[in-house]
Amino acid sequence: MRSLLILVLCFLPLAALGKVFGRCELAAAMKRHGLDNYRGYSLGNWVCAAKFESNFNTQATNRNTDGSTDYGILQINSRWWCNDGRTPGSRNLCNIPCSALLSSDITASVNCAKKIVSDGNGMNAWVAWRNRCKGTDVQAWIRGCRL
């Protein structure tokens, strides 16, 4: 029993770090956070963007050629939206550390995404959305989900 407790305590911090969501699980979480029809974008748009940006992985990171990094389930960029402490000239318009975007709790990612989508370019700010989701049947991404 004691060794089981030690094992659980060792892995507990890992559970808080990040998560790979299921499609419907993410759709439900995004809906709870108010993304369904936010700025006119249906929930399917957001789920599609997350699929092609991060494969539903909150811990996804990708380094860009300009030295910035994209973080989290929606691949939010450190040049403009968050501070990672290593991107020169970071604007940090969401006023958050980039590490907050890697959590299994998607609140910081959703709140920042709401600022991004309100910034004038809408979801065109996400290259993967523009290339893989825009103009497609994005409702397919939430079809069969109990929302």
From Swiss-Prot:
Gene name of this polypeptide: LYZ
Assembly and interaction partners: Monomer.
Protein origin, superkingdom: Eukaryota
Note: Lysozyme C is capable of both hydrolysis and transglycosylation; it also shows a slight esterase activity. It acts rapidly on both peptide-substituted and unsubstituted peptidoglycan, and slowly on chitin oligosaccharides.
Protein name: Lysozyme C
Any one GO BP annotation for this protein: cell wall macromolecule catabolic process
Catalytic activity as recorded in UniProt: Hydrolysis of (1->4)-beta-linkages between N-acetylmuramic acid and N-acetyl-D-glucosamine residues in a peptidoglycan and between N-acetyl-D-glucosamine residues in chitodextrins
GO CC, any one term: endoplasmic reticulum
PROSITE patterns assigned: GLYCOSYL_HYDROL_F22_1, GLYCOSYL_HYDROL_F22_2
